[in-house]
Regions:
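C-terminal catalytic domain of Rieske-type non-heme iron oxygenases
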Residues: 1-250
């Protein structure tokens, strides 16, 4: 279990001896630099030093803008090359899934906490038995001892629908160069895939069991798979499904 090794006015430090993934990635250190910067730092032996860095900026009551970076320092060239081949917008889709893991839960939870009296009531309101809860408890201690409250006196807005909480287009895609460009290209590719599919169907019909029939079937299969994949990518750039990855069966 992670433990808090230092708490002060400027934040706190934590250390997790086992580390994530049951120790496969090595020990992890954590730093919360008050009031809004936090990072995890670990070195996976034989692979890389991995950091998860998040800067949270409150923009209105109950809503923050997150600036996240995931720096790697690889110990060999091969992993760096392989990760570099993955388009940035695909990485962003994966990042959305991580952020949305708690999205609905936290949206409800902050309203429960507000009704109970806010951060001073966190210890009485929440049961926090998990490894990650030590960070949450330490953050509330810092807030109650040293932190101010942005938008003091304002009430939380009405609870949003799950569909709105899962939005990715308004919150990210339209403002991200990589994701917005990918979305335009995906939408432009769909008519071409349909054209190939219809052309393949014509080949199957005209081939009369000859070689062109086989070509038509192959082209139809490829076009169908392409349409299926671009639909998945488009959805991934537009909205999440609300299914937390940690709750899915292995």
């Amino acid at each position: 279990m992670a433990s808090i090794i230092r708490e002060a006015e400027d934040g706190f430090d934590a250390f997790w001896q086992e580390g994530p993934r049951r120790g496969k990635l090595g020990s992890q250190t954590t730093r919360f630099q008050a009031p809004q910067l936090m990072w995890h730092d670990l070195t996976a032996k034989g692979f890389a030093r991995i950091l998860t860095v998040v800067y949270a900026v409150p923009i209105r009551r109950g809503e923050c803008r997150l600036f996240a970076r995931f720096p790697f320092q690889f110990q060999s060239a091969a992993p760096k090359l392989l990760i570099g081949l993955r388009p940035r917008w695909l990485q962003h889709i994966g990042n959305h899934k991580v952020l949305e893991d708690d999205q609905v839960f936290l949206h409800w939870q902050e309203r429960v906490l507000e009704r109970a009296g806010g951060s001073p009531a966190a210890d009485r309101t929440f049961f926090m038995p998990n490894k990650a809860d030590v960070y949450v408890a330490a953050l509330h201690r810092w807030l109650n001892s040293n932190g101010g409250e942005p938008f003091a006196g304002e009430l939380l807005p009405e609870r949003q629908r799950n569909e709105d909480l899962m939005d990715r287009f308004q919150s990210h895609t339209k403002s991200c160069r990589s994701c917005s460009t990918a979305l335009k290209r995906i939408r432009a590719a769909r008519p071409w895939a349909w054209a190939v599919l219809w052309g393949a169907a014509a080949l199957v019909g005209l081939g009369q069991g000859g070689p062109w029939t086989a070509v038509g079937f192959a082209a139809a299969a490829l076009a169908g798979l392409t349409l299926r994949q671009v639909s998945r990518w488009e959805k991934g750039l537009m909205r999440g499904d609300g299914a937390a990855p940690r709750n899915q069966l292995a």
